[in-house]
């Protein structure tokens, strides 16, 4: 069928560890610093809303975290007067300076120490 595909081989990946990470006692300043240092580069677009952190959005869909409205930007009601606010949001700014999921997340590559090696296949 001549279907093109890529094999994505990785030597390791990170575990966000949402069931074992507990930053619930951290103050607002420390949570903002954690979010800032995380450098998680993606946002999610779902149901007409942009989410500050795609992992927080995934966790909400999976039932591991609550969905928090002020961590999103609603594009369904967007008008040009909100252009600056949208640009700031896309650059990683939100009202709190972090997302609630940070309290359960070990962070992205720059700060995450939970490195996971892939399993090796044994020959038959």
Task: Tell what function each PLM region has.
Residues 45-47, 110-116:
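Extracellular/mature segments of secreted proteins
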Residues 4-15, 56-111:
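C-terminal accessory region of radical SAM enzymes
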Residues 1-57:
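A C-terminal junction/extension of Radical SAM enzymes
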Residues 116-124:
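Short cysteine/histidine-rich metal-coordination sites, predominantly Zn2+-binding motifs
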């Amino acid at each position: 069928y001549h279907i093109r595909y890529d094999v994505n081989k990785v030597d390791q990946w990170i575990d966000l560890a949402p069931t074992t990470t507990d930053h619930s006692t951290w103050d607002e300043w420390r949570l903002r610093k954690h979010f800032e240092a995380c450098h998680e580069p993606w946002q999610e677009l779902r149901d007409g809303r942009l989410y500050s952190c795609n992992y927080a959005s995934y966790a909400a869909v999976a039932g591991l975290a609550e969905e928090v409205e002020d961590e999103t930007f609603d594009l369904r009601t967007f008008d040009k007067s909100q252009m600056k606010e949208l640009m700031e949001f896309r650059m990683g700014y939100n009202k709190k300076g972090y997302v609630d999921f940070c309290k359960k997340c070990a962070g992205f590559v720059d700060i995450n120490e939970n490195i996971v090696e892939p399993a090796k296949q044994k020959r038959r």
